[in-house]
Curated annotation (Swiss-Prot):
UniProt keyword annotations, A-Z: Acetylation, Disease variant, Membrane, Mitochondrion, Mitochondrion inner membrane, Phosphoprotein, Primary mitochondrial disease, Transit peptide, Transmembrane, Transmembrane helix
Protein encoded by which gene: COX4I1
Transit peptide per record: 1-22
Pathway given in the UniProt record: Energy metabolism; oxidative phosphorylation
Topological domains, Mitochondrial intermembrane: 125-169
Classification of source organism: Eukaryota, Metazoa, Chordata, Craniata, Vertebrata
SUPFAM superfamilies: Mitochondrial cytochrome c oxidase subunit IV
Major location category of this protein: mitochondrion
Function, as annotated: Component of the cytochrome c oxidase, the last enzyme in the mitochondrial electron transport chain which drives oxidative phosphorylation. The respiratory chain contains 3 multisubunit complexes succinate dehydrogenase (complex II, CII), ubiquinol-cytochrome c oxidoreductase (cytochrome b-c1 complex, complex III, CIII) and cytochrome c oxidase (complex IV, CIV), that cooperate to transfer electrons derived from NADH and succinate to molecular oxygen, creating an electrochemical gradient over the inner membrane that drives transmembrane transport and the ATP synthase.
Protein known as: Cytochrome c oxidase subunit 4 isoform 1, mitochondrial
Membrane-spanning intervals of the chain: 99-124
Bilayer topology: Single-pass membrane protein
Coiled-coil residues: none
CC terms in the record's Gene Ontology section: cytosol; membrane; mitochondrial inner membrane; mitochondrial intermembrane space; mitochondrial membrane; mitochondrion; nucleoplasm; respiratory chain complex IV
Organism, scientific name: Homo sapiens
Length: 169
């Protein structure tokens, strides 16, 4: 009895220790959503924060150069300053994406797959159509309803001319 308790205690201790070790394996830093975030949107053209949060040494030097006259900056430097602040220009934001092709392709795949399933069901699952679907059967059924004078006021029998044996015009 004592041996089983010892093994049980050792087993529980080993499991709990390994769980604790695994739990502290990596630390995930969560994003603080109370701070403003960068977003490229046409309806929100000036985001609260810059696109690049941590500047490199060359970008810091360029930011210092920006404080002087802008006429001394080259076109490439102006573009690089713009890219520090914004990820995309309005032309790039307005550019159409090719996502619609993926959506249409996926929809067509599922429509085609559904068509294959329906064809398989018609061939292997469903039996032949009942005889009541034949045109001859429907004609006989209609003739019988006319002979019985079904619904003579507003229905089928009211539209049949019994003297001429044809539909009223």
């Amino acid at each position: 009895m004592l041996a089983t308790r010892v093994f049980s205690l050792v087993g529980k201790r080993a499991i709990s220790t390994s769980v604790c070790v695994r739990a502290h394996e990596s630390v995930v830093k969560s994003e603080d959503f109370s701070l403003p975030a960068y977003m490229d949107r046409r309806d929100h053209p000036l985001p609260e924060v810059a696109h690049v949060k941590h500047l490199s040494a060359s970008q810091k030097a360029l930011k210092e150069k920006e404080k002087a006259s802008w006429s001394s900056l080259s076109m490439d430097e102006k573009v690089e300053l713009y890219r520090i602040k914004f990820k995309e220009s309005f032309a790039e934001m307005n550019r159409g994406s090719n996502e619609w092709k993926t959506v249409v392709g996926g929809a067509m795949f599922f429509i085609g797959f559904t068509a294959l399933v329906i064809m398989w069901q018609k061939h292997y699952v469903y039996g032949p159509l009942p005889q009541s679907f034949d045109k001859e059967w429907v004609a006989k059924q209609t003739k019988r309803m006319l002979d019985m004078k079904v619904n003579p006021i507003q229905g089928l029998a009211s539209k049949w001319d019994y003297e001429k044996n044809e539909w009223k015009k």
